[in-house]
């Protein structure tokens, strides 16, 4: 069994991820660690705490109508929507409905929204919530999908991000490479 280290969030010590050191290849990048964020995505308390950190970047400045969830981030997305819509006289979204949706992959590997969800994206201010951002390719695909369906991207939120921006859009994350000793990521052709 591989050894892991637990990494606690600087903003909330109740939030933690497990990092396994090794050489891990994805379709888009090679990484020095595998980050297990399963508990944060599926455990009630951790998902709620994660949303509590991420909401601070958007609640007072950005109107969000829809949260597009990627990579199994729907539980966090639901708590995030609740925090955004909470009755707070300073919140831009106070008392508003916030949709939480997930695109699907079609038979060609393209991200799509089914007809019954397009109205929740078209003409809406959208926050992209993604579990991890390493190279930014999955985020770019989601951004293209949001744009195709007429949504207006307001930001990107992530549990972990190895990069600060995707195509000039800031990525607000709970964890970054600075939190994980020795973390490195590289594009496939640049792998050492």
Positions of predicted regions on the chain:
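Glycine-/small-residue-rich active-site loops that bind phosphorylated ligands and cofactors
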Residues: 42, 72-73, 134, 163
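Short, well-ordered alpha-helices that flank and scaffold nucleotide-derived cofactor binding pockets
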Residues: 56, 82, 86, 144, ...
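Conserved acidic residues
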Residues: 65, 124, 154
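Short glycine-rich phosphate-binding loop at a beta-alpha junction
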Residues: 62-73
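Hydrophobic Val/Ile/Leu positions in short beta-strands of Rossmann-like dinucleotide-binding domains
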Residues: 69, 128-129
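Short, glycine/charge-rich flexible loops or terminal/linker lids adjacent to PRPP-binding catalytic cores
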Residues: 74-127, 134-137
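PRPP-dependent phosphoribosyltransferase catalytic core
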Residues: 2-7, 11, 141-192
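Active-site-facing substrate-recognition patch
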Residues: 1-63
């Amino acid at each position: 069994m591989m050894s892991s280290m637990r990494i606690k969030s600087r903003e909330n010590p109740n939030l933690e991820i497990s990092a396994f050191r090794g050489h891990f290849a994805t379709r888009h990048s090679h990484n020095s660690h595998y980050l297990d964020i399963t508990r944060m995505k599926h455990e009630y308390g951790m998902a709620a705490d994660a949303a509590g950190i991420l909401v601070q970047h958007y609640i007072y400045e950005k109107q969000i109508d829809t949260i597009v969830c990627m990579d199994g981030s729907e539980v966090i997305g639901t708590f995030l929507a609740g925090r955004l819509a909470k009755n707070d006289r300073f919140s831009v979204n106070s008392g508003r409905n916030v949709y939480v949706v997930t695109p699907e992959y079609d038979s060609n590997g393209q991200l799509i929204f089914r007809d019954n969800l397009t109205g929740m994206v078209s003409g809406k201010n959208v926050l992209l919530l993604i579990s991890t951002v390493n190279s930014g390719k999955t985020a770019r695909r989601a951004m293209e999908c949001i744009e195709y369906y007429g949504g207006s991207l307001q930001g990107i939120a992530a549990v972990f991000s190895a990069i600060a921006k995707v195509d000039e859009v800031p990525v607000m994350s709970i964890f970054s490479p600075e939190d994980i000793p020795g973390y490195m990521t590289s594009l496939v052709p640049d792998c050492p």
